Amino acid sequence: MQHHPALHNTAIESDVNRRAFMQSVASSAAVVGGLTLSESAHAAPDGKSPIIDTHMHVWANDPKRYPFPHPYSKDFKKPPHEGTVEMLMKDMDRHGCTHSVLVQVIYHGWDNTYVADCVKRYPKRLKAHGLIDPTDPKVADKMEFWMKEHGLHGMRFSAIYYENGKHGGDGWINARETHRVWRKAEKLGAVFNYFIAPKQLPKLETMVRAHPKVRVIIDHLSQMDLGAEDPEPDFRLLLAMAKYPNVWVKVSELSSVSKSGKYPFPDAYPHVKRVYEAFGPDRLLFGTGYPGAARAGYNRPPLNKEIDLFRKEIPFFTPEDQEKILGRNAAHLWGFGKST
């Protein structure tokens, strides 16, 4: 991958005044992304609260039409398991999952055509986030292209792949040029989700503070290693993001972040509770990762077990919390159920 020194070496620290920031947030918190908090785009077709999986990877089974240009692995040929949108829809229907947010899988690289086509096939049930090369000088324009021309709803940035100098380093997270991307995101109404390591969060915080109207999701509890000898310093970096009302967290991937890795992951509950107490139930999201039979291949529980994790296993979520986390929060965030 080509290295762009201007992006990696010109990180800036925004001097946004705390009071000005909070005033800006206050003016926009009730209307985030065009949705007032009184609007209810929450109902499933049967009138019940929706179940929205906010983190679903799907990939094509047709490499000629949808190739696999993995950006970090030149030797990559094809995924080890199938994970098509047809598998996803069957899984959703079987377990009462009303909607999903597709998150472009790394297998298809920066070509988001497959997830865009999936949304066109199932526009009432799916939204999609693409991947774009964060070191590309035209990243803002490419985001606009995928959103305006192909109907994507946001972008994922996988900062974790650039940690510790990998692939040119993660200086792009808060580089001067990156502010243009965030300004464009505000204009487009884009939602960002970040696959990011805890020690990278201070760089993200710079951007969140400078752009309080851009909605940002931290994936997988910031891929926290809860089995580390002392996870507390990293965990505090995640909790520090709670003071920004435009930040949400996915309570996901407990199979990989918990110490035990064994369902229902009770050793992770004390940490999840601290995130819950810091961010509140309105800014937590449900997401699982893979469709159908692919779940077992990637060591993930079945979809019904993932749903039960919030409904039956994690002990401190109230019934109202469960509805919010499993779907209502996502309905607000992405506008599920609203006419387009």
Regions found by a protein language model. Name each.
Residues A41-A43:
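Boundary at the C-terminal end of the N-terminal hydrophobic targeting segment
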Residues Q2-H8, D15-G33, P45-T54, Y72-H99, ...:
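Mid-to-C-terminal alpha-helical segments outside catalytic/metal-binding sites
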Residues H55-N61, H220:
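Histidine-centered divalent metal-coordination motifs
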Residues T84-L88, D111-Y114, K138-K142, L201-L204, ...:
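Alpha-helical scaffolding within the catalytic cores
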Residues A60-E86, D91-H95, E149-G168, V214-R215, ...:
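Active-site gating loops and adjacent loop-to-helix segments of metal-dependent hydrolytic enzymes
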Residues H153, D170-F286, A294, D321, ...:
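Catalytic pocket-lining loop regions of alpha/beta-barrel enzymes
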Residues T98, H108-K199, T206, K250-L254, ...:
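Active-site gating/metal-coordination segments in enzymes
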